[in-house]
Amino acid sequence: GIFAAEGEDPESGLFRLRETDTAIPRNLFLDYDCAALLIALLGMLPHADRDEVWDEIPFRHPARVVLRYDLRGQATASDNARDIKRLVELAGPHRCTPISPRTSEPEYELLELDYLAGDIEIDFADPEVIRRMADNSREPDQWFSALYKLQLLGVDEWSGAVKRALRRDSFQGHVEKPLKGKLPLSVQELWMSDGERTVALDDLSDGEMQLLLTLGAVRLFGDDETLFLYDEPETHLNPSWRTRFHLDFEKANEAKGNAQAIISSHSPFL
């Protein structure tokens, strides 16, 4: 709230209100375009957490992800370069494949990146990567927030007409997201593992993808101050998963607190 709790002051009988900062709300809109990014970062969670929350999904462990970044022409490149640099360090040496010329000396002094565009491969099964993730001060939800913001810079690809239309408070209509190839950050490949075999994320069923995304968001962002708004989160789930969705929500929610959810659904199972 705006006001802090009143402390006990035996020497003062006055009632005082002490102001305190109100936390800034964090609004995240998660759709299937950012599903791969969120699911990839589940690889930063402990192995046991994924076993507990998604025990009925065989290929629930992210094994390897290839993230493509492209800071060419980005006005905020200097701010985002720090996140890319940390990502390259996390992946380890020789895990970044350049897709642009080497940066000039002035560019390197500003950004500290050898290349403005490249593919970063993170192997979640590599013991050294696991060690670096454990030593890293950033939590998975903080990684997602940083990379999600970088992904949002793709709106710069909107046409001038679309940008002008969005400035009007009365605007009503549909705006297409920029193509994946024009985003400053995108997931090129994501492979999932059952502990022995690996498959591409696209080979998972729609229901498995939906359960990984919806419960993954709860596991990463759920706390006492979080409210999830779900619009038919069960569309691709089988009847058993639909019936138990509220129990799975609570299970994913145990790690951080007591997040709440408002769900719209036509399903009698849910």
Give the role of each language-model region.
Residues 1, 182-270:
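Secondary-structure-rich domain cores
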